[in-house]
Swiss-Prot record:
A Pfam family reported for this protein in Swiss-Prot or TrEMBL: Cupin_1
Residue stretches making up the Cupin type-1 domain: 167-314
Similarity annotation: Belongs to the 11S seed storage protein (globulins) family.
GN (gene name): LEB7
Region (Disordered): 47-87, 102-155
Key words of the record: Disulfide bond, Seed storage protein, Storage protein
Compositionally biased spans, kind Acidic residues: 135-144
Feature: compositional bias, Basic and acidic residues: 105-118
Protein name: Legumin type B
SMART domains recorded: Cupin_1
GO MF: nutrient reservoir activity
The organism's place on the tree of life at top rank: Eukaryota
Keyword Disulfide bond appears in the UniProt entry: yes
Taxonomic lineage of the native organism: Eukaryota, Viridiplantae, Streptophyta, Embryophyta, Tracheophyta
């Protein structure tokens, strides 16, 4: 679930061997290996896995939850979304342009529909990247390991009988992320509600105002169950092959299951907002947002990976990065 890229800055070809540990405790899906690409039009690395998933996708076409609203729009967009094998190819160019506050051409390049370079991209002139010193990286790693080893040993351990068992994450003042035009996000995990450590669960409360968007993101170490408590909106889920396995309207009382590492985005409707709870199967569930990944990725890497001009990279990293909560109309007005 952690995005990464590799660059050979040597004078000789590099052969890398990757070991995929599907039995890792962080993997909550199954023993089937999956590779999720954010960019490019990669070749299929596990063809037997894709064939099996495509058969299921053709049989179900989408997750059997709630009404299948917006079917006409889904059919119109299906042709565009068939191109490309990256996770962003499962979203329409129009939606990506709204989410990242970019031009239509930039959004189309993010989907990489006709990119023939597959997984490996040749960089002309080399990459210009600022790297931290090796000693600094080692010190940061040692500090992280020290903090992990000290977790839960503060001398004031809570007993089962005295554990706090209730937390109101819907309070406005409790919000962890807030956009006055788009909405708010609040989370509860074992750090804020320690009893969740025994249940191995965490929760997220999302409130989206009209037309508000929760930009594409994925859960690194948990499956999740989305339950709509108010309003209506649209949810899109994309798998490792770039297929939109779910793209439907959701309403109050409906459930949607989002598998680990599948990219998901939500948008409230035009008439009313959308409020929902997300229950996650990890007491410290971690979320990665595509926008944050773009901002943390060196400009030269983005330019070469997506075939972008420098102006488009700047637009993507800065103008289009205002947090995971987005209101498309307010962004376009501010430009």
């Amino acid at each position: 679930g952690i995005p990464y890229w590799t660059y050979n800055n040597g004078d000789e070809p590099l052969v890398a061997i990757s070991l995929l540990d599907t039995s890792n405790i962080a993997n909550q899906l199954d023993s089937t290996p999956r590779v999720f690409y954010l960019g490019g039009n990669p070749e299929v690395e596990f063809p037997e896995t894709q064939e099996e998933q495509q058969e299921r996708h053709q049989q179900k076409h989408s997750l059997p939850v709630g009404r299948r609203g917006g079917q006409h729009q889904q059919e119109e967009e299906s042709e565009e979304q068939k191109d490309g094998n990256s996770v962003l190819s499962g979203f329409s160019s129009e939606f990506l342009a709204q989410t990242f506050n970019t031009e239509e051409d930039t959004a189309k390049r993010l989907r990489s529909p006709r990119d023939k370079r597959n997984q490996i991209v040749r960089v002309e002139g080399g990459l210009r990247i600022i790297n931290p010193e090796g000693q600094q990286e080692e010190e940061e790693q040692e500090e992280e390991e020290k903090q992990r080893s000290e977790q839960g040993r503060n001398g004031l351990e809570e007993t089962i009988c005295s554990l706090k068992i209730r937390e109101n994450i819907a309070q406005p003042a409790r919000a962890d992320l807030y956009n006055p035009r788009a909405g708010s996000i609040s989370t509860a995990n074992s750090l804020t509600l320690p009893i969740l450590r025994y249940l191995r669960l965490s929760a997220e409360y999302v409130r989206l105002y009209r037309n508000g968007i929760y930009a594409p993101h994925w859960n690194i170490n948990a499956n999740s169950l989305l339950y709509v408590i108010r309003g209506e909106g649209r949810v899109r889920i994309v798998n490792s092959q770039g297929n939109a396995v779910f793209d439907n309207k959701v309403r109050k009382g409906q459930l949607v299951v989002v598998p680990q590492n599948f990219v998901v985005a939500e948008q409230a409707g035009e008439e009313e907002g959308l409020e929902y709870l997300v229950f996650k199967t990890n007491d410290r569930a971690a979320v990665s947002h595509v926008q944050q990944v773009f901002r943390a990725t060196p400009a030269d890497v983005l330019a070469n990976a997506f075939g972008l001009r420098q102006r488009q990279v700047t637009e993507l990293k800065l103008s289009g990065n205002r947090g995971p909560l987005v209101h498309p109309h307010s962004q376009s007005q501010s430009n």
